[in-house]
């Protein structure tokens, strides 16, 4: 009886742990099929959504391409995210101190907790990131005047 109960609990735990990307058929996206679009927030950056809809509460896998010498001011996200640097050298700093940061080379991974202030930048080369999070997406700039969406209006 105890074994059955433990197996049932373990089965439920595994079921709840399966990401929301589960589907009936395999999905393959080759690099040649990627259609990069203008990033909705950062003019000059590009993005492609590989999995999910960032307006919905589901698993999202997104790539973002930043040009050289690009800066993202201090901001937060309402979700935690796992970021992998695919190419280029990327800088990330926690908090709003613009002098401190960690250099991340291709293959580096960093995890950002929800609602933690951070800012990022590139130096002399283009950077491509892959970002994994659970939507809906969102960004809040610490200084509202830094929000590029407001500057575009």
Language-model-detected regions and their locations in the chain:
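Short acidic-glycine-tyrosine-enriched beta hairpin
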Residues: 53-55, 90, 95-115
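Positively charged n-region of N-terminal signal peptides that target proteins for export
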Residues: 1-5
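Glycine- and acidic-residue-biased ligand/ion/polar-headgroup-sensing regions
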Residues: 67-70, 77-97
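A short, N-terminal "cap"/entry segment at the start of jelly-roll beta-barrel domains
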Residues: 21-60, 145-153
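His-enriched metal-coordination microenvironments in redox/metal-binding proteins
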Residues: 41-42, 54-58, 73-84
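Double-stranded beta-helix
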Residues: 25-27, 119-153
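Bacterial N-terminal signal peptides
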Residues: 7-17
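Conserved short histidine dyad/triad with adjacent acidic residue
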Residues: 60-77, 101-105, 113-115
């Amino acid at each position: 009886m105890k074994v059955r109960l433990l197996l049932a609990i373990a089965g439920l735990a595994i079921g709840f742990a399966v990401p929301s990307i589960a589907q009936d058929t395999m999905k393959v996206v080759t690099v040649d099929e990627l259609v990069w679009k203008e990033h909705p927030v950062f003019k000059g950056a590009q993005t492609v959504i590989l999995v999910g809809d960032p307006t919905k509460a589901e698993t999202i896998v997104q790539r973002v391409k930043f040009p050289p010498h690009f800066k993202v001011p201090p901001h937060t996200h309402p979700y935690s995210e796992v970021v992998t640097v695919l190419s280029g050298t990327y800088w990330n700093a926690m908090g709003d101190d613009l002098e401190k940061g960690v250099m991340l080379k291709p293959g580096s991974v960093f995890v950002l907790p929800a609602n933690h202030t951070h800012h990022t930048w590139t130096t002399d080369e283009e950077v491509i990131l892959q970002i994994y999070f659970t939507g809906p997406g969102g960004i809040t700039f610490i200084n509202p005047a830094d929000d590029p969406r407001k500057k575009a209006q």
